[in-house]
């Protein structure tokens, strides 16, 4: 189930729809209704729950057809009755009426980005009705308008504004899921920043220690005690001085290539331990 489907499943169950059915019809029909012929009209719904909502409340004589993607309603109604719905303006109505209209508009043409795979939050309502788009812009002033695929669209990209819209249309479960996703995202980003800072500090420490060790090594090579050490140990010190980042294996390979001497990595490690003791 997508997050859009989850939100719509919650909205369909809102009891306000039954109480303000004509407002709901207006919000839905202003985007979704098509005139077939004479006084015959059609519209589509995509969920079983929304289909049942119309079956229970639609006062017109209707018939339904089911396909794999949607349910098609066809009904007969007087054009004056339909025009009243299509021209309904709720921008100056009480809050509950505005909420029902927005619920219908979202159920008709709304979508929101999925929580799992999306890093950028996006909510939109598409409509082919300029009158409805203008109402949506007034009902929720944070909406911005654009055109996508020959459809008018109002949209939100801000996390806070999407949360506010979900609360306005009483999609409270969706709002909480959205909040939790943002908290997870913020926590992950904070952990990543913290981890990056720790790595950066560690690298600074390592570089500082390496610089100190190199100075101590060069000082030891110049000391009188250096010449008293075994030849291979002296060679190790010189190699380490010239190539401080080499691994044990690289140094062992160099011994074999340069001096034809086989020294195991454990032997090189032994040189390293002795050098650290001498440089302390």
Swiss-Prot record:
Molecular function terms from GO: DNA binding
SUPFAM superfamilies hit by this protein: Homing endonucleases (SSF55608)
Keywords: Cell cycle, Cell division, DNA-binding
Top-level taxon in the UniProt lineage: Bacteria
UniProt DNA-binding region: 247-279
Example GO BP: cell division
Pfam families: HTH_WhiA, LAGLIDADG_WhiA
InterPro entries: Homing_endonucl (IPR027434), Sporulation_regulator_WhiA (IPR003802), Sporulation_regulator_WhiA_C (IPR023054), WhiA_LAGLIDADG_dom (IPR039518)
Family as reported in the entry's similarity comment: Belongs to the WhiA family.
Primary role: Involved in cell division and chromosome segregation.
Listed name of the protein: Probable cell division protein WhiA
Organism: Mycoplasma genitalium (strain ATCC 33530 / DSM 19775 / NCTC 10195 / G37) (Mycoplasmoides genitalium)
Upper classification of the organism: Bacteria, Bacillati, Mycoplasmatota, Mycoplasmoidales, Mycoplasmoidaceae
Gene that this sequence comes from: whiA
């Amino acid at each position: 189930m997508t997050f859009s489907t989850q939100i719509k499943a919650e909205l369909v169950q809102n009891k306000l729809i039954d109480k303000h059915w004509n407002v709901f019809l207006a919000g839905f029909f202003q985007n979704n209704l098509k005139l077939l012929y004479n006084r015959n009209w059609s519209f589509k719904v995509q969920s079983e729950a929304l289909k049942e909502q119309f079956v229970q409340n639609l006062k017109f004589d209707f018939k339904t057809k089911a396909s794999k993607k949607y349910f098609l309603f066809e009904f007969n109604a007087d054009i004056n009755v339909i025009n009243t719905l299509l021209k309904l303006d709720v921008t100056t109505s009480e809050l509950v009426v505005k909420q029902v209209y927005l619920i219908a508009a979202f159920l008709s043409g709304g979508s929101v980005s999925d929580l799992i795979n999306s890093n950028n939050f996006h909510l939109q309502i598409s409509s082919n009705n300029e009158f409805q788009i203008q109402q949506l812009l007034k009902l929720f002033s944070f909406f911005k308008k654009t055109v996508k695929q020959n459809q008018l669209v109002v949209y939100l990209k801000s996390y806070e504004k999407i949360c506010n819209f979900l609360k306005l249309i009483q999609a409270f479960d969706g709002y909480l899921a959205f909040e939790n996703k943002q908290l997870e995202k913020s926590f992950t980003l904070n952990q990543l920043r913290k981890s990056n800072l720790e790595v950066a500090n560690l690298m600074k420490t390592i570089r500082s220690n390496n610089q100190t060790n190199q100075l101590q090594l060069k000082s030891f090579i110049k000391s009188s005690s250096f010449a008293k050490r075994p030849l291979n140990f002296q060679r190790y010190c010189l190699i380490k001085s010239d190539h401080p980042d080499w691994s044990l294996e690289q140094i062992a390979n160099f011994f074999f290539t340069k001096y034809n001497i086989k020294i195991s990595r454990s032997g090189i490690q032994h040189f390293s331990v002795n050098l650290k003791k001498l440089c302390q």
